[in-house]
Amino acid sequence: MPMSLRLHNNLTRRVEPFAPLDPSSPTLYVCGPTVYNYAHIGNARGPVVFDVLAALLRRRYGALRYARNITDVDDKINAAAQAQGVPISTITDRFAAIYRQDMAALGVVPPDIEPEATAHIPQIVAMIEQLIATGHAYAAEGHVLFSVSSFEDYGKLSRRDPDEMLAGARVDVAPYKRDPGDFVLWKPSSDDLPGWPSPWGRGRPGWHIECSAMAAAHLGPTIDIHAGGVDLQFPHHENEIAQSECAHGGATFARFWLHNGMLNFSGAKMSKSLGNIETVHELIARHPPEALRYALLSAHYRQPLDWSDGLIEQAKNTLDRLYGTLRDLAALEAESGSDLAVSMTIPAEVESALDDDLNTPLALSVMASIASDARALRSDLMQSGQASARMIELHAARAKLLGAGMALGLLQQDPAAWFSRGTDAGDDARITALVEERSAAKKAKDFARADAIRKQLAEEGIVLEDTPQGVRWKRA
């Protein structure tokens, strides 16, 4: 039997046994993307890691209510739409769809609930009204602000002193604020920006209140696990706690807080602001998506991960060995006349590794050991000629390796499909997807991206032809 699930709770800074409030329906909320551009590979670490957690919770409890939001109203979105001269929905619809496609390519199972901020304006307004009514927020010059001093536990997650928090939040010290640390719940909108009617005039919500309202609407006032990147711990998650607990009479907002570490690239944190990012979309065009998933799981989720081409290549080579093992085991079974259906069971050693605060590096190591044992068994059976006599043992070895992969979202394709990557059939689908993306980029007036795709295809010897039926491509 696997041990009980233990998770590092960033609220207490301790690894603690996890038990949901309602064992029949644990709840998980993960902060999702702001859809104004392509997600970079650092943005994918959380979805991949917490996909492993979601699968573990479903196995353990038989059910899960998992929400991951879409932020589709934000100043960055407004800026992107204005820069490209297109409606805001053109930006958000496009990049939300690309995000979903990219996550699917990485093997990330969609959440049960994917709330969008713009679909929850009534809930956001109602929460703000409750905060004003209880003295935790105030209206000023068309804005509504949360009064940080009204919540004595402010800072309990990040454990920063007030001066540190003020610096970290990068808040505007506007004249209408009662305290420099007060943050925006609602802001006025000019006619050229998205806005909704409210008791405080036409406006739009602040970022932090969106997650609080969406989490409460779908998961209730108290959720079991709230997860996201460590860069969101302050101010975003700190502010979520303040808003939510004040709006719900002091009820604990989230019982466990999980934060994944950042990706580093050439020794520096990967971020859009530093310009050192690699997008998921570009990477999955050049590499097997499963190798990217493996690489993202290769370090413990709370630790930084050094991202490099070498890491991806190492992941590819490891998957080559693992899929090669599965292929060879299946071939030996077939040669010996086996018609047993594979019944995957996740090995206890893998479950125990994941129960230890999602120790994916240990789980990957266990999977490698299982594969090594399976190869040794195959060699022994081939040399001794006992494959037929020990068919159940051989079959169990393959099922065990597949089960280990299933727990991590790996090894779920046919080995032949894995080894056919880069062939004309696989490449044709990739090129067609790039051509379609280029057409969508041109329609959205994202000419920089369209030109970049054309250049990439030209370097690969792909010629594009405009026809009345649309764009066609051929190899030069």
Swiss-Prot record:
Catalytic activity, as annotated: tRNA(Cys) + L-cysteine + ATP = L-cysteinyl-tRNA(Cys) + AMP + diphosphate
Taxonomy, superkingdom = Bacteria
EC main class here is ligase
SUPFAM superfamilies, alphabetized: Anticodon-binding domain of a subclass of class I aminoacyl-tRNA synthetases, Nucleotidylyl transferase
Q: Which residues bind Zn(2+)?
A: 31, 211, 236, 240
Annotated ATP binding lies at: 272
Going by the UniProt record, its keywords in alphabetical order are: Aminoacyl-tRNA synthetase, ATP-binding, Cytoplasm, Ligase, Metal-binding, Nucleotide-binding, Protein biosynthesis, Zinc
Q: Where is this motif: 'KMSKS' region?
A: 269-273
Which ranges belong to the motif 'HIGH' region? 33-43
* InterPro entries (alphabetical): Cys-tRNA-ligase, Cys-tRNA-synt_Ia_DALR, Cys-tRNA/MSH_ligase, CysS_C, Rossmann-like_a/b/a_fold, tRNA-synt_1_cat_dom, tRNAsynth_Ia_anticodon-bd
Point out the coiled-coil segments of this chain. none
UniProt lists the family membership as follows: Belongs to the class-I aminoacyl-tRNA synthetase family.
**Subunit structure, briefly?**
Monomer.
List the protein's name. Answer: Cysteine--tRNA ligase
